[in-house]
C-alpha cells in the first residue's frame, strides 16, 4: 500500500494572496484580493500600521465593505458593484482601483482613488440607465470599521468595535457625516475617520446589526432593496461600520448620474468627535470636483469555484 506524504496545512500570508495594492505619500493604502474584494485599508507611518477596516477579506467569502446600486420598479433589486459578489470587471493603476460592468439595465463604473498626499479616499460611482424606461435608483456605501492595530482587531473584533465612538454631524452641503474614533489607545494614539457623500447622504447606519435585522434577513444583499431606508440611528455595538444612503434619483433612458463617497482619516485624534471636526472636510469638495478620468485595462476577477456553490443542507 502506497503511503501518502504528510500534508501540512498553513494559513496563507499576504505574499501568498496575490494582492493588488495602491498607496499614496501619506501612508494610506488599499489592498484588493484577486476576486476584487477589499482586503484591507491601512495607514502606515513610523513603523506603525493601523487598519481602518475591521476584518480582512477572504478569497472565498470576500469582505464586508461594498457599494450597491438599488433599483426600483415592480421587482426592486440591489446590485453589488465591488467585491466577490460583483459580476463586472476590475482593473488598477498607480492611484486608483476600478470596477465596471452592466447589470439589470444599468451600466456602472466605480473608481476608488487616493489623494496623492493626504489621508483622503474617494469612491466615485458613475451610472447610466440603459433601460427603455425611466428608472428610480439610489446608492448605498458600506465600510466596516476597526481603527486599530491588526493584532488588536483580530484578537477580538467585537471587543475592538465596542470601543469605537460614533458621532453624527450635519454638514451644510454634504448633510450627514459619520465620524468614528477608536477610544482604546493604539500605542498612545486614537485613530479617527469620517465618512460622507459629496452629494448629500439621506440615511445611515453605524453597525452591521442594523443592516441585518428581520426586514433584511432574507434579502440577497445586506443593503436591502430600493425603498428600504437605512435606520439613521446611532448604534454602538460589535460590528462597527459607516453605512450611507444617497438621495434617490430617477434616470431617463440613456441618462447618467454620479455619486462620490469619501473618507478622511487621522492617525491620532486626541479629543472626542464634535461638530468642529467638519473643518477637516474643507478640501473634500474641491478634490471631488477635480476628479480626472484615467484609461485602465479591465479584466474578469478570479472567482473561486466554491464561492457560488450551493450551501449544504
Regions found by a protein language model. Name each.
Residues 95-117:
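Low-complexity, acidic Ser/Thr/Pro/Gly-rich terminal tails and inter-domain linkers that flank the onset
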Residues 135, 249-267:
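Short Pro-Gly-centered flexible turn/kink motifs
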Amino acid at each position: 500500500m502506497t503511503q501518502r506524504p504528510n500534508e501540512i496545512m498553513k494559513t496563507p500570508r499576504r505574499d501568498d494572496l496575490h494582492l493588488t495594492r495602491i498607496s499614496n505619500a501619506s501612508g494610506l493604502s488599499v489592498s484588493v484580493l484577486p476576486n476584487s474584494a477589499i482586503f484591507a485599508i491601512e495607514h502606515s507611518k513610523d513603523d506603525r500600521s493601523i487598519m481602518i477596516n475591521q476584518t480582512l477579506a477572504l478569497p472565498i467569502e470576500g469582505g464586508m465593505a461594498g457599494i450597491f446600486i438599488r433599483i426600483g420598479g415592480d421587482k426592486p433589486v440591489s446590485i453589488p458593484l465591488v467585491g466577490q459578489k460583483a459580476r463586472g470587471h476590475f482593473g488598477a493603476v498607480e492611484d486608483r482601483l476600478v470596477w465596471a460592468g452592466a447589470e439589470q439595465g444599468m451600466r456602472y463604473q466605480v473608481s476608488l482613488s487616493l489623494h496623492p498626499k493626504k489621508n483622503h479616499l474617494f469612491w466615485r460611482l458613475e451610472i447610466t440607465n440603459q433601460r427603455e424606461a425611466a428608472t428610480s435608483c439610489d446608492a448605498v456605501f458600506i465600510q466596516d470599521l476597526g481603527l486599530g492595530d491588526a493584532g488588536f482587531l483580530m484578537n477580538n473584533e467585537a471587543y475592538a468595535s465596542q470601543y469605537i465612538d460614533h458621532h453624527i454631524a450635519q454638514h451644510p452641503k454634504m448633510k450627514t457625516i459619520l465620524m468614528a474614533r477608536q477610544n482604546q489607545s493604539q500605542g498612545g494614539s486614537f485613530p479617527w475617520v469620517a465618512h460622507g457623500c459629496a452629494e448629500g447622504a439621506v440615511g445611515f447606519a453605524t453597525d452591521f446589526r442594523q443592516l441585518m435585522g428581520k426586514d433584511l434577513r432574507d434579502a440577497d444583499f445586506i443593503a436591502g432593496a430600493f425603498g428600504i431606508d437605512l435606520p439613521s440611528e446611532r448604534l454602538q455595538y460589535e460590528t462597527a461600520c459607516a453605512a450611507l444612503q444617497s438621495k434617490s434619483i430617477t434616470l431617463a433612458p440613456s441618462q447618467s448620474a454620479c455619486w462620490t463617497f469619501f473618507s478622511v482619516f487621522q492617525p491620532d485624534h486626541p479629543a472626542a468627535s464634535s461638530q468642529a471636526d467638519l473643518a477637516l472636510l474643507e478640501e473634500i469638495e474641491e478634490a471631488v470636483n477635480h476628479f480626472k478620468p484615467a484609461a485602465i485595462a479591465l479584466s474578469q476577477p478570479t472567482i473561486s469555484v466554491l464561492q457560488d456553490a450551493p450551501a449544504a443542507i
